[in-house]
Amino acid sequence: MYGHHPDYGYGNYGHPPPFAGPESSNSHYGMPPSQGTNSQNNMMMRSQATEPQPIGNTVSPLEFRIHDMNRRLYIFSSTGVSENDQQQWWDAFSHEFFDDDCKLWFVIGSEPVAFASRERYIINRQFIPKFFRSIFDSGMRELQYVLRGPSRECTLANGSQAYENENVLQITRYDQSSQFEVNTEGKLYVEFAPFDEVMNYRIKAWTLELKRSNEFVYNQNTADYRVEAQNPEQENKPRMGFFKSTFNLMTMLKILDPMQSIMSSAKSAPAITPREVMKRTLFQHHQVRQQNMRQQQLNQQMMIPAPEPEKPKPARKRQRKPAANPRGSKKATAAAAAAAAAATNGVPPTVPTASPANNQQFPPNPMTSQFQQMSYPDVMVVGEPSMMGSEFGENDERTISRVENSQYDPNAMQMQSLGQGPNSSMNINGRNMMNQHHPGMQPPPGQQHMPPHSMGSQMPTSMHNPMHMPPGSMQGHGGMPPMPSTMANQMPPPNLPPHTMSNQMPNSRMPPMQGQMPPSGMPGQMSNPNMMGSGMPPMSMSSQMPGSMSNPMPNQMPGGMQMNQMPPPNYSQYTGGPPPQWPPPNSAMITG
């Protein structure tokens, strides 16, 4: 019914048993005797030496320790120990299996009873020998604990080993008018002290919950145990496997357990008053409790691996970042600030260093005709900080200064807004200059933008765009005769070399008219050779000419006319129409 009778053998541990194993019986939880055998054959089998059989699978050291305790209890019941030696024997038994600070807890009560309402008994280490002796003195002749079902083992934080089994059977036998056996089911939780090479594992805490009990009586006719009918007239009847005398001792120990320290202190110093004894006892109890807490913390620290030491952080070296413009970091900073201010106001940057045309990784972004370039009366300049590498929130000594723009002209701003200034017409038509070419020539491959220092950027808009003039003649200013539109349309295309300008001029010649100069407000006439375009550096035309044409030559002819005012050779062939003016009003001839 309850499985095989435990066979306590040392088959898996290499040591033969020092005593004979428990005699097999016809108990209800043991194997029934085989049919066809008689008592003589059983006696012959008992006399034969048999090897100890292992207990199923490999037994854990904690579980084997409980089996070893059962074996010692069987030795006491099977061997005759004299009355005088029993106290010493139980002291040795308690010292071998129980730690010096061990305590036994017994929780007795049936399952319907609430756990808080069940009987609780506590037995201190000092009374453990007396407890086991009272069990056998009350009439019990055998006591053992059978571990059934799976068990759990774990290591606690303080280094102790815990063992738990929820299906434990406590078997006790006693003899009165007949042989009786009491099987009590319960739950066992045992905490073992750390392993010791001399004492092995010893029990530090023992908690046994006894739930229900069944009593069986041995039948001599059938040689088997049967369930005994309840006999209320029986005086000394066990309850939960213990007799009444054992329960009386457990009740007395429950009362004496809190008083043990006080009683021991009173015996050691009889002259001290009970009040002083209680103070000393409380102080000692507090010291022991603090020591246990420190020991637990130390064990936890030993179990937790020590963290790796942190490497010291390397000393931070403050290094000044290299300037984006090695030639002048202040100029680069000012250019970046001007570009940021222009972008904030909705105007594209006009500084060459901030232009996308100078940066190959940005795609070209031509300016539309709706935008008007604007000038600013002052420029915000962000100075270089005196200490680089400072963290956020620390001292950042960036200084912001205001520099006056010397080239700012309010009148030019107003003229640009009305479309009358020289820069407005050039910038508006600058978009066509980049996208159109001469009808008789192929556009240069892959060339969308001309560099700032090229000749095309230095020439007026009238030379770059031969189609920008409206049909018909252009009205002159200040008494100057009108100029036909064919003259402006025959100017050289933007990509032709400078020396081809004379081939595109009109064929008719006309002597220059003295004393007539184009007004400063005429479109296409340069009032300042250095103001070719916003943001373009001033360049001389001689620097853009080929080497054969840039040689120094005399700047004045014998007649008193400047060389740059002389008409081309075929200018005298002009026929028809009013006499033209030389130089033409819309020409790109740079005057001295």
From Swiss-Prot:
LIM interaction domain (LID) domain boundaries: 378-417
Recorded GO MF terms: DNA-binding transcription factor activity; DNA-binding transcription factor binding; LIM domain binding; transcription coregulator activity
Disruption phenotype annotation: RNAi-mediated knockdown causes mechanosensory defects and uncoordination in L1 and L2 larval stage animals; phenotypes become weaker in later stages and eventually disappear in young adults. RNAi-mediated knockdown causes defects in vulval morphology and gonad arms. RNAi-mediated knockdown reduces the level of bed-3 and col-124 mRNAs and increases the level of lin-29 mRNA.
Tissue expression profile of the protein: Expressed in all neurons and some other tissues of the adult, including vulval muscle, and, in males, all the neurons of the tail region. Expressed in vulval cells.
Biased composition, class Pro residues, residue ranges: 577-586
Ranges of biased composition (kind: Polar residues): 23-41, 352-368
Similarity-based family: Belongs to the LDB family.
The protein's name in its UniProt record: LIM domain-binding protein 1
Natural source organism: Caenorhabditis elegans
